[in-house]
Amino acid sequence: MNTQKKWTIITGVIIVIVSVVVAWGLYHHQQESEKKKQQREKVQINNPNVKLFQNITYNNHLPGSQLDIMMPDDVDKDTKLPVIFWMHGGGYVAGDKQYKNPLLSQIVEQGYVVVNVNYALAPNYKYPTPLIQFDDAIQFIKHNKDRFPIDLDQVVIGGDSAGAQLTSQYVAMQTNSSLRSEMGFEQR
């Protein structure tokens, strides 16, 4: 094989490799941009029977420390309703409370107040940060209970996926003093 033909083949291979790398980089960048765009866009509940208070900060020291409160639109000021504290899923590294609001608004229509809690995500914030934040959110609601039609004698705590694990561990700590002590939590 002569030298010119060899260099033509090598140049062609290099062009193909560079093209594949550039195409992959552009595709990856486009996918990341789309993912970030979807995360920024608000999920609307579009439910006229539900009043929504969004992005209430319950802790000023950690990111993601906001909660949404949903209640029936027609509740009168003297009524107290059962409250559901909810944490979203996402494998501890993704997700946002807003994505569950449409489903949770259907529960609200049945006569509940829902407190939908966001938390700081891994890997930047390690366990047990979400548990600490969930406790902070509950304490925030306890301190502000007179502002909302909440009956703290009727409480449901739940979540989906990672949120289900976190909330069930939180409940276990509330009912098991040795676990609570091992985790370094105080019952407030």
Where are these regions (language model features)?
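N-terminal Sec-pathway targeting helices
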Residues: M1-V16
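N-terminal cap/lid segment of alpha/beta-hydrolase-fold proteins
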Residues: E32-T79
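Short beta-strand element of the alpha/beta-hydrolase
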Residues: D78-G90
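Primarily recognizes the serine-hydrolase "nucleophile elbow" in alpha/beta-hydrolase
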Residues: Q139-R188
